[in-house]
Design a protein with these regions (language model features):
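Terminal (and in a subset, N-terminal) low-complexity or junction segments at the ends
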Residues: 1-242
Length: 242
């Protein structure tokens, strides 16, 4: 097998969490000396595989052994830590990447904002995420994508700032909010038990995709969590399917 075949196999292992199979492939790569010949291709594939399987220690070891590290390798490692909500590690990697002369990419900021969201338990992280988001365009000259804006909605939503999140969606988005954005808002409403805003987000999700099963389930749960006063509306949520 060549480097591309190994990289595709590692991606498949990561997607299904088959870390044992991934380790066997890693051993084959080492035995054949392929990592030294295809440093970045296989290095990033290994980092992604280990990260998706939840073994950040192995991902870090692979990264440390890479002879050459470009922004893609840094992003792969940062993404792994972000998925686990390791904000301090993500910030360290982000700063180290800058110090080593690599400018952050679009993916770098997705990881940074996601890490802020997953670790969000106080207003300070909302401020940190907002600073990072604004720095994209003002300092790094990167135009935020829909994914970055949705990350900010997730951050505000997890922090309980639902009104601010809705205001951002309806007044500040430079493009039309998509299904993912409204679903993110709906999930935040479920977390905080906000029935009115939840229904608002739910209706927008249905306008974009009326077969979104997850949205129906989430809205029903919002009503159920609201206990007796809203239980009669559970049937209403189901009626949207008709």
């Amino acid at each position: 097998p060549d480097a591309i075949t190994y990289a595709c196999s590692l991606k498949a292992c990561g997607n299904i969490g088959a870390i044992d199979k991934g380790r066997k492939i890693h051993l084959e790569i080492d035995r054949n000396g392929l990592l030294s010949k295809h440093n970045l291709t296989l290095g990033c594939a290994l980092i992604n595989m280990y990260s998706k399987c939840g073994s950040l220690a192995d991902a870090q070891i692979v990264f440390t052994k890479l002879r050459i590290r470009d922004v893609i390798a840094w992003d792969a490692l940062m993404t792994g830590y972000a998925q686990m909500g390791k904000l301090k590690d993500v910030l360290y990697i982000f700063k180290k990447m800058n110090a080593d002369g690599h400018r952050p990419s679009v993916i770098s900021f997705v990881s940074l904002l996601n890490a802020c969201s997953h670790a969000c338990s106080h207003v300070g992280l909302v401020e940190a995420g907002t600073i990072a988001f604004n720095a994209m365009s003002t300092f790094y000259f990167i135009t935020p994508t829909m994914e970055h804006y949705t990350c900010m909605i997730d951050l505000l939503g997890r922090a309980g700032q639902l009104d601010h999140a809705l205001m951002a969606i309806e007044d500040k988005f430079p493009f039309h909010p998509d299904n993912v954005t409204w679903s993110t808002m709906l999930s935040a409403c479920r977390k905080w038990g906000n029935v009115d805003l939840g229904k608002h987000a739910f209706q927008h999700v249905l306008q974009l995709n009326d077969k979104e099963d997850g949205a129906y389930t989430c809205m029903c749960n919002i009503y159920i969590d609201a206990k007796g006063s809203q239980c009669k509306h559970v049937e209403e949520a189901h009626l949207y399917r008709l």
